[in-house]
Amino acid sequence: MHLRNRLLHCLSNGEFHSGEALGASLGRSRMAGGKHLKGLREAGLEFEVGRGKGYRLARPRELLDAERIRSALGSEAREAVGDIDVFLELDSTSNWLRERAQQDAVSASVCLAEMQHGGRGRHGRQWVSPFAANLYLSLLWRSDQAAASLGGLSLAAGIGLMRCLRHFGVGQAGLKWPNDVLVDGAKLAGILVDVTGELSGPCTVVIGVGINVDMPPGAATGIEQAWTDMNSLAGSMDVSRNRLAATLLDELLPVLQAFDAGGLQPFMQEWQQHDVLAGQQVDISLPDRTISGRACGIDATGALLVETAAGRKRFGAGEASLRSRS
């Protein structure tokens, strides 16, 4: 086990541990324990120091564990899921899975990380990924569909994510086209889908999901939009990230199977129920211009429909935002 991971396992119970005990947990000196403790601080973890007691995490952290995730899966997902790989740090769970896909990784392989250095959202934006705080999960999916028919897949995946969140009492969330989950205008989660393969199929799909679970306020200073997290919404209940990962897979896998069979059509009504843009005045930011109008839902390909001064337009790409009211 990685030394930093071993130190985390020692600290994860929320109890105080002396410098000597931390060093001993690594089979090293107190000084070596202090060095790795400093590394955890730099990764964003907060500690309390008790005089004569030692160190403890400011709040206990449940570490991700592949076996705990697998054991929490429903029977169908447990049979379908391939390898579950959990890492302390990665540049990106999706990048790692894309590389594995080229080495014949099986469909429904899963990758998670406690921290990402290169996590990203749409248009290459950084996804803030503090250590052991949120859920960063990517799923590999092999599809026989043509690449052009997979345009609505990220929207269908959003339905799976919404179903997952309801298990944790998050019933007030909405979907913002194409891939954000918002609660009262604040971002809770996001999805990024990468598709590679032949135009006529088959295709390799990597679905990256980021869910804010327990975002440290200090780590959120680089986030440019309003945000929220699961623990804030759940009140006094601390959300288990292992259970959250398993529930997400339980809900996401049947959605992907249904999408392969029938496209986005089976999910249209459910999407419309959660569409936060429907009927709203929006701006669609394109590389060369911005188009304004009233959002009118989506079509069966996943494109956003907007009623503009020049008539109804459909957008398969772009950044949608609610128009500010002057």
Per-region residue spans from a language model:
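Long, positively charged amphipathic alpha-helical accessory segments at protein N-termini or as interdomain linkers
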Residues: 1-29, 35-38, 42-43, 145-173, ...
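N-terminal lobe of the biotin/lipoate ligase/transferase fold
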Residues: 2-167, 187, 196, 239
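Short loop/edge segments at beta-strand edges and connector loops
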Residues: 88, 175-177
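A short, compositionally biased micro-patch
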Residues: 50, 130, 176, 298-299
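Conserved active-site carboxylates
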Residues: 180
